[in-house]
């Protein structure tokens, strides 16, 4: 909400360091809590590799500790849905090993579409030149972006206006997925 209200405010993200992951994983190791970590997609961030490095260091110090780092393959709300279902699976009695396997298999069923309000984040992240974001903003360009089971983003189409972008998303969904409602 603060990003919408203050157009001058720019948020940036950075990958979590292996050291930070190590600290968190070590708390679970010391407590003896088997852990499954659903990580942001490797296709979009180096966080997954940092978590794997930390997991390897933890396993050297705590060889009996059960720790599984799973690439959730899902940016945005799909990651939240996967995490919520993982909690249900864990509560139904899955072991950490079984839960990691379930999560690794389940994320291949996730696929999503979205559009952006502005192109500024793409320019700030170096995905498009700032001039393209500026011109695109003036022309009310809205990209239709999808992500696949590996979490990789791809441009599906470019629309003029949010309504057209949302219609394109709905049409792509109808064209590519069968559903019973």
Residue ranges of model-derived segments:
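Mixed-charge interfacial surface used for oligomerization/domain docking
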Residues: 1, 43, 47, 51-57, ...
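Short catalytic-loop micro-motif centered on adjacent basic/acidic residues
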Residues: 12, 37, 69
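N-terminal glycine-rich phosphate/adenylate-binding segment common to multiple enzyme folds
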Residues: 20-48
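N-terminal glycine-rich anion-binding loop in soluble enzyme alpha/beta folds
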Residues: 1-20
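Residue-identity detector for threonine
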Residues: 13, 17, 35, 95, ...
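Short, charged beta->alpha transition segments
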Residues: 18-28, 53-57, 169
